[in-house]
Structure formats: C-alpha cells, structure tokens
Curated annotation (Swiss-Prot):
Compartments where located: Cytoplasm
Segments passing through the bilayer: none
Gene: dnaN
Name of the molecule in the record: Beta sliding clamp
Family under the similarity heading: Belongs to the beta sliding clamp family.
C-alpha cells in the first residue's frame, strides 16, 4: 500500500472512526484502525469496530498501490493530529509496519495484519429503508438528550425508532421525562412497518458523521434481528440493537388538559438559566407559578444556606392558578430541544405529567414529571 492524502481529511476520518475503538479491547487488533487503500477508486477507507459498534468512512486520496493494514488507533491519531494542517501525508506499508511521512518528518509504526481485523456485520434483509438526512437529524436532536445514562435500565439508554407509512417516530425516556418526535420521511415510504431501539452512543456518532460527511442523498437503513446499519455513499455505521420491550410511552401522554400556557421559548429559557444558578444542588428544584390574572409565569428558587431568586415571564394562560415544581435541568433541556419561537405548556395538576410542545408545524412532544417539594 502506498498513498498520499491531505492531513485534514485523514485527521477528520480518524476522529470519526476512533469512537468505535474500545478502551479495553479483548483482542489486540480491536485497538487498531483498519486502513484500506484502493487504486481503482482512488480512495482510502478507515474502519474501527468494538464488536458492538462499527464505523467506516472513506475519502479521496492519491493511491499508488492498493493494500490494507491495521495501525494503533490512539498512536496514529496522536501523530496525525499534530501534523501541519492541510499538509500532504504519505503513507506506505511494509509487511506489518507502516511509514508515515510529511515534509521532513517520518514516523514508523508497528501494525497488525488486516486479515486479523473482524469484518463488519452484514444485515441479511435485502430491502433498505431510505431516510432523508434532515428527518433523521431532526429526530435525533429532539430525543437523544432524554435517554437514560443508567446502564441498569439498558433499554432506556437508546432511542426507539418506529418506522410508519406516514413517516418516522423517535422516542426516548429515562423514566423522569419523555421526548417524542414525529418527522415526515421525504425519501421513501417503507414497505413494512417496524420498530427498533438503537443505543444512544451509536446514534450520537451517526449524528456526528452526518454533520461532517453528510450529503443530500438518502441514508439507507438496514435492519435485521439484533443489528442495524446506516449507510450513505461509502459511509457506514453498524450497531447492535438493544434487547427488550420498549415502554408503551403513548399511554403516558395525557389526552386532555385543564391548563394551557403559551410563552416565548427563548425568554423562558433565559430566565430559567439565570435563576438555575441558585437552584438547590440536592434536587435542582425550581417552582413555577401560573398567574393568569397578570398573564405571567413566575419562577422561583429557594436554596437553603445559599439564597433565593425570582423571575417573571409574560405568558398567555388559560385555566386556574397553580404552583408546580420541576427539576431545572429537565425543564431547560426540553426547552432547548423544542427549538421554535413560541411553545405551549399543557398541564392538569402539580402531580401529573406536564407536556411541552412547539406552537407551529414541528411535531415534538416533551413530557416531564413534576417533583414534590416539602412546604
């Protein structure tokens, strides 16, 4: 193998695939990145695989000789990231070693034969669902933040993706809040409906890949028992799916409300972030008071031995006055995800689920449970 490529392209590709390199590999070759050069296509592909998540990306290079080798991911990344930006990098392998040259610098690295690197899993289903990149990104940004970080609740650490004839539905919950996004899939209508829960780690990497290597072309989703693959062009991400029954989240969302608040999202978020500085570190609690008589939403925190704070935001309120408390982080993260000018807050009591949604065409539902405070 012998090739010349740009430092910035190699560096970007390494940063993408390195996220699939395990921190404690159970086989030495899994700590490496597979580099494969093709003189026919004049492209260099990089692959990393931890036996659960696999990422493959490629870019244009001047390939003199085809070939493949695996090199230590961390060492290669550390060297390439320190090379001059946009410089020409020459990479040549010789048996189980590789030489990387740039300008007057030359680096030799021991590698492992490409034959020892495991192949990325193939999905047996022949038919792929074509997803529009914009619909995929919209769904991921509106739900990923609500996944659980608790590995004992394994099914809740992923996003539940439901493919329907009229589009895609994304859902995520950690048991305290629920985010649901419905998007139209402009790319194609699925032949069959299906649902799959994909680990949030894989989907965050997918979101990052689309942002860096995305294009206007559709993204193909292949799904088979236990495995999901996203592919566009020569970009490829494969992930094991999460086992178990995802909660029936639809039944958690109330159908009727006796109170409704319409408010400017950015104004409420700004007030929330200011007052959150004083929120009690133990429960992150903030009180919201609905004041329909004065058309305002009052925010208050009272942290023992720290201090207190109050804010008020203009709002259109339908219904009776009410005082309710929330975890300030859950409320702020939901407001950030809604990403529209005006939102509505629908609620019934200070002990029942509260639903936030945008006023407009965007179909996002964010449900959050209030918390109970001692008087």
């Amino acid at each position: 193998m012998k090739l010349v490529c740009r430092q910035n392209e190699l560096n970007t590709s390494l940063s993408l695939v390195s996220r699939a390199v395990p921190s404690r590999p159970n086989h030495p070759v899994l700590a490496n990145v597979l580099l494969a050069a093709d003189a026919g296509t004049q492209r260099l592909s990089l692959t990393a695989f931890d036996l659960s998540l696999g990422i493959q990306t490629s870019f244009a290079a001047q390939v003199e000789r085809s070939g493949a080798i695996t090199l230590p991911a961390k060492l290669l990344n550390d060297i390439v990231s320190r090379l001059p930006n946009d410089s020409d990098v020459t990479l040549e392998d010789n048996d189980a070693a590789a030489t990387l040259s740039v300008g007057s610098g030359q680096y030799q690295m021991r590698g492992i034969s490409a034959d020892e690197f495991p192949e990325l899993p193939l999905v047996q289903s022949q038919e792929a669902l074509q997803l529009s990149a914009s619909a995929l990104i919209e769904g991921l940004r509106g739900t990923l933040f609500a996944t659980s970080g608790d590995e004992t609740k394994q099914i809740l650490t992923g996003v539940h993706l439901k493919v329907q004839p009229d589009g895609l539905e994304f859902a995520a919950t950690d048991g305290h809040r629920l985010a649901v996004v419905k998007t139209e899939n402009a790319a194609a209508t699925p032949a069959t409906e299906f649902a799959v829960t994909v680990p949030s780690r894989a989907l965050r990497d997918l979101e990052r890949m689309i942002a860096i290597r995305g294009s206007d072309e559709a993204i193909a989703l292949y799904h088979d028992q236990g495995q999901t693959v996203f592919q566009w062009g020569d970009q490829y991400l494969t992930s094991r799916t999460l086992d178990g029954q995802y909660p029936n989240y639809g039944q958690l969302i109330p159908r009727e409300f006796n109170r409704n608040v319409a408010v400017d999202r950015k104004r409420l978020l700004a007030a929330l972030e200011r007052i959150a500085v004083l929120a009690d570190q133990q429960n992150n609690a903030i009180r919201l008071s609905l004041d329909p008589e004065n058309n305002r939403l009052a925010l208050a925190v009272d942290a023992q031995d720290v201090g207190s704070g109050q804010e008020a935001v203009p709002a259109e309120i339908i219904g009776e006055p009410l005082e309710i408390a929330f975890n300030v982080r859950y409320l702020a993260e939901g407001l950030k995800a809604l990403n529209t000018t005006d939102i509505q807050i629908q609620l019934n009591s200070n002990t029942s689920p509260v639903v936030l949604s945008p006023l407009g065409p965007v179909k996002i539902t964010y449900l959050v449970m209030p918390i109970q405070l001692r008087s």
